Amino acid sequence: MAIITMKSLLEAGVHFGHQVKRLDPRMKRFIFSERNEIHILDLQKTLQGIKDSYELVQRVIKDGKKVLFVGTKKQASEIIEQEARRSDMPYVNNRWLGGMLSNFNTIRKSVQKLKKLEKMEVDGTFDMISKKEISQLNREKSKLAKNLTGIKDMETLPGAIFIIDPKREQIAINEARKLKIPIISVVDTNCNPDVIDCPIPGNDDAIRSVALFTKIISDAILESDKEVGIQIIENLNEEDLMKEIEIKNDKSDSIEERGE
C-alpha cells in the first residue's frame, strides 16, 4: 500500500513553486501562500491530485492498458526510466518525436526497424557484412534507440500518459488531447492546469519532488490488483508542518535546480 504524508511532500520540496513573477494565472486556485517572492503550493490540493491520479492509473491498468511515462528534462530523465521500468511501462525520457501518438503507425515502423537491427547484431548477420556496413548500421541503431527504446514494447496507444513538466512536453500533451488520452501531470506554478485531466500541483524541478511523484504513479500500477490502494495520512496541519521544515535550505535547493 502506498502511504503519503503531508510531511513527506514538504521534505521533498513539493510545495515550492516558481518566483511570483512567473505565475500562470490559471494556477491561482492551487496557491497556498507566498514566501520570499516564491509561491507556495497548497498541499491539500496536491494530495487530492495524487489521489485522483492514483485512482485513474489503477482503472487504466485494470482495463488492460498501459501508462506512458514522459519526462525529458535533465531532472526527470533518469527517474522516468527507472520507475517506468520498475512498473514495466513504456517511457519517453530523451526527446518526444512528433507523431509518437498522433502518427503511431509510422512510429511503430521505426520501432520495427530498431528491433530488426538489434536482432541482426545477435543472430550472426553482422559476421557476414563489412566493418563499414556494421558501423553504418550501428549508427542507425543508436540513433533509433536513443528515442525509441522506451516504447519498443508499446504495441498500442496508451490508456493514459503521465508527464513531468507540461510546459516542456507541450507536443505530447497536444497529441494526447487530440486522441482523448487522459493526461496526468505535475503542474508547477508556471503551468496551465486546464489542459491536464488529472493535475497534481507540485514542484516539477526539484529531483526529490519529481522522484516522489513518479514513484507514486509507478506504485499505483504495481498495486492495481489490490483492494486497498493509496493511504493519505495528515497528522499535522500544513502550516505547522511548514514550520518544522527549514524553508531557507529547501528553497535554495529548489531555486538552484530551476536556475532562478
From Swiss-Prot:
GO cellular component: cytosolic small ribosomal subunit
Organism superkingdom: Bacteria
GO MF term list: structural constituent of ribosome
GO biological-process terms attached to the record: translation
Keywords of this entry: Ribonucleoprotein, Ribosomal protein
Keyword check for Aminoacyl-tRNA synthetase: no
Any Pfam family matching the protein: Ribosomal_S2
InterPro entries: Ribosomal_uS2, Ribosomal_uS2_bac/mit/plastid, Ribosomal_uS2_CS, Ribosomal_uS2_flav_dom_sf
PANTHER family linked to this entry: 30S RIBOSOMAL PROTEIN S2 PROKARYOTIC AND ORGANELLAR, SMALL RIBOSOMAL SUBUNIT PROTEIN US2M
Family the UniProt entry places it in: Belongs to the universal ribosomal protein uS2 family.
Protein name: Small ribosomal subunit protein uS2
Organism whose genome encodes this protein: Borreliella burgdorferi (strain ATCC 35210 / DSM 4680 / CIP 102532 / B31)
Record gene name: rpsB
